[in-house]
Amino acid sequence: MKVECASNIGFCFGVRRAINILEKTASERGGVETLGALVHNQQVLNRLSGMGVRVVKNIDDISGRTVAISSHGVGPAVLAELKSKGLEIVDTTCPFVKRAQVAAKRFHDAGFFTVIYGDVNHPEVKGILGWAGGNGLATLNPQGLDDIPDLSRYIGVLSQTTQIPTGFTSFVKNVIDQALVKDAEIRIADTLCHDIRDRQAAALELAGRVDLMLVIGGHNSANTRHLLDLCKTVSNTHLIETASELQTDWLKGVSRIGITSGASTDETTISEVCSYLDRLSAGA
């Protein structure tokens, strides 16, 4: 049984940057609170907790004088409230998310209605909507804007950073088809994360060459679920968070296994899965 990892695996640039910032802050100050989970990966959060990083869900729960913004970012109203309380803000927002926030603000300032291709319940999308100044919406409806009445003639379109590129492209085409009949002006911002795009392409290529594909990452991680959906289109694929979730009956008749991971999956977890597979292979 041969195991091969995708060429783009482990922490993405934005997650690694956020973790480095938090580790440094926690070390210097003996701990730090984050407004919301830094990433959607429990193993990483457990390790950070051991370093004194505490997750708070609401601003009123903050007990210290320093608070970290997660890699998913927040809207301007949240930032203003934190500043009004005199809190020192450590911003770990992913640069790609920041770029999407800037695009939404630019649309708003130009008088455009912002349409985000993304999950309205995801913290990243909530933050981006905040930068649209209340003049926007988020949807994953592949048909575009069919269900939205009285749409503005001025429309700015962008994407949640971790969405699948082909999905965003299809969405944009549908928006254009619907909006042009209304004599609309449309602006499109490419806010997809380059790292995630490369990761998805590498995973898809590997999935096409193996009998079984394993995606390692948090079950509540958006980018991990997108990897799962992509790989399932070409190979038998399962999502696991740790090696303990791997089921041996998946391996029956399998000679080649491919591995990819979500952007917030740490190298230790990946190594544990690979080691477990090696032991199973040796005992076969």
Swiss-Prot record:
The keyword 4Fe-4S applies. GO terms for biological process: dimethylallyl diphosphate biosynthetic process; isopentenyl diphosphate biosynthetic process, methylerythritol 4-phosphate pathway; terpenoid biosynthetic process. Dimethylallyl diphosphate binds at residues 40, 72, 122, 221, 223, 264. GO terms for molecular function: 4 iron, 4 sulfur cluster binding; 4-hydroxy-3-methylbut-2-enyl diphosphate reductase activity; metal ion binding. It is an enzyme of class 1 (oxidoreductase). It catalyses: isopentenyl diphosphate + 2 oxidized [2Fe-2S]-[ferredoxin] + H2O = (2E)-4-hydroxy-3-methylbut-2-enyl diphosphate + 2 reduced [2Fe-2S]-[ferredoxin] + 2 H(+); dimethylallyl diphosphate + 2 oxidized [2Fe-2S]-[ferredoxin] + H2O = (2E)-4-hydroxy-3-methylbut-2-enyl diphosphate + 2 reduced [2Fe-2S]-[ferredoxin] + 2 H(+). This is 4-hydroxy-3-methylbut-2-enyl diphosphate reductase. It comes from Dehalococcoides mccartyi (strain CBDB1).
